[in-house]
Amino acid sequence: MRDFLSNGAKKHSFHHRISCIILTVCIMLSSTFLALAAPNTAAPTLETVQTESQKSAAYLMKQADYSNISNVSTFKDQSRSLILSIRSGYDCSDNINAYLEAVKQIMNTDGTLHMEKNEYTPDSKDYYSSYAYLLLVLALADEDAANFNNNNMVTLFNDILNAAPENDFIYSDTNPDALNLYHLGIVNLAVESYSNEMKDYISISEKIKKALKAISTEKGINYWGYSLDNNTHVYSYFYNMYTSDSEIKNLIDTVLTYTTNTYYDSVNGTFNYPDYNDPTKFNPNENSTALAAALYATYNNHELSSVAFNTLTTLYQSSTTPGAYTFFGEDSIFTTYDALYGLVAYQMSLSGKPNPFDVSDITKTVKPPVTEEPEKPTEDFTTVLNPSESPEQSVKNLDTDTPTSPATGDSSLLVLFIILGLCSLTLLVKTTNICKPKK
């Protein structure tokens, strides 16, 4: 009897130790799983964000090509990259000179820009945005927009917009020649930035406001469907109206609430894009994450802009090319375009400054005396641009043969945790039965 009790006690002790070990492992794994899955809301330092934005600026500035700037789409991409790179603090002196020389090559004697016609919509008003981008670059380059290449570009911009009928600003499927939805916001910021010098500012601004209301719904912008991307490409440029017009504020607040509730995965910290095969399903997306940083930084949502920054730099940063961001694991200049916007917008938000495309801080401020800046170290961030890559990247279904990291919804750790927990429970029950005295 004593031997039986002794053996029972030993077995009890053995099973008890095993159970404790397994329980400890389960707790550790569950903690790890929760840490990996939870959004990282910790705010990075301004220096950290600026370092990342300047790396991406260097990557894009070294690939800048102004040879085909008469194309409206190319003009947009090259102008945006230059503006954001300047805002990041990266030394863009050579790029600024090359850009302005390229613009002069397509400028007529009256200051108008000789832009190529769009093959599908030859009467498109998208070229309005080319003047807007140029004005923003001129401000950042410390050039006099009222006397650039012997032309007053502010007056020219004012006259073009003032002469345009309201319908030119309201894009729709039935009005495809109007200013594209993605161009409306940048025109608005150029108008706001130069409002003191535009004699028809009030009437032009009213046209833009009517257009914004006309293209908006409670979900935001319907352009080939609804998405966070669409909402960022429009509403991130209207913070000025948001703060000065209660009607626009209510409109944008509604859109921001819908955007967060629909496209933000608060469990995994990802920002999602609708699946092309099933619009009710959403997949984590690189560009959406980058643009989320820009949208939430503009509207001072520090928690979500921090999450977007952390997710972007953790999951989508190139492991081989400094400054580049990836699209399905491969370096993509187009994802990097959006990433630079998100990074610089967040950088400026942390600095207490407005959207990077708003140059009112320059055009409406008395400039201090020019002082020499210390030379910035230059680094050779180069990569090969894939010429076949299209700006209109199709979003693949992430559910098909696409490995996911724990932060984007990998459930393997959770499954392991459940299995180990069940094993531990079984051992505890068995141990209890062995040691239970017989009646």
Regions found by a protein language model. Name each.
Residues 38-90:
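An edge-strand/N-cap motif at the start of beta-rich repeat modules
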Residues 48-68, 94-119, 148-174, 199-223, ...:
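Long, well-ordered core segments of solenoidal/helical folds
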Residues 430-431:
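Single-pass type I membrane-protein transmembrane alpha-helix
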Residues 38-47, 149, 308-313, 317, ...:
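Compact disulfide-stabilized, cysteine-rich extracellular microdomains and processed peptide cores
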Residues 1-11, 22-28, 34-53, 351-425, ...:
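Intrinsically disordered, low-complexity repeat and linker tracts
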Residues 38-44, 63-64, 88-90, 96, ...:
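Ser/Thr/Asn(+Pro)-rich, low-complexity disordered segments
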Residues 67-92, 116-146, 169-201, 217-251, ...:
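An alpha-helical repeat/solenoid feature that recognizes helix-turn-helix modules
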